[in-house]
Amino acid sequence: MRKVRFRSRTEHTLDTKGRLNFPRRFSDVLESFESQDLIIAPFKTHLRIYPLAEWEELETKMHNHGGEQNLSGWVRYVVGGVVEAALDKQGRLLIPQTLRLDAGLEKNVVLNGMLSWIEIWDATAWASEQQAVRDGFEDFSEGLRNMGIL
């Protein structure tokens, strides 16, 4: 059976209450999970949305290895900032104000599928990030070769 993944990116606008119209292609992927519950987590320059099952796998990794390599501060930041969420009846996701402020999200945002999770970026920050990736594309060559992609 083919595993369903979050792929592609879309531009969206947050409404005045911080709600986001969740793209149908992402909600279709979400339907493949037992639970429709989501976890929204802060991640320095953006937010990440995880299906609950994916988040629980990450929590297990953090529990087993979070004390290693001085990761306790990172675990504290991420786990302390998570919010459990679900889509409303209109298919919208409420992004709490604390998380919007933390990630610098104002109105225009980009949702980017990352296979197991979705990123939410401020549109301006996303453009800067993409330019930095394009400028340093050669830096990925060795890793891509090791994966058999190049």
Swiss-Prot record:
Record-annotated disulphide pairs: none
UniProt subcellular location: Cytoplasm, Nucleoid
GO biological process, one term: negative regulation of DNA-templated transcription initiation
Gene Ontology cellular component annotations, sorted alphabetically: cytoplasm; nucleoid
Gene Ontology molecular function, alphabetical: DNA-binding transcription factor activity; transcription cis-regulatory region binding
Assembly with partners or alone: Forms oligomers.
Family statement drawn from the similarity comment of this UniProt entry: Belongs to the MraZ family.
Protein known as: Transcriptional regulator MraZ
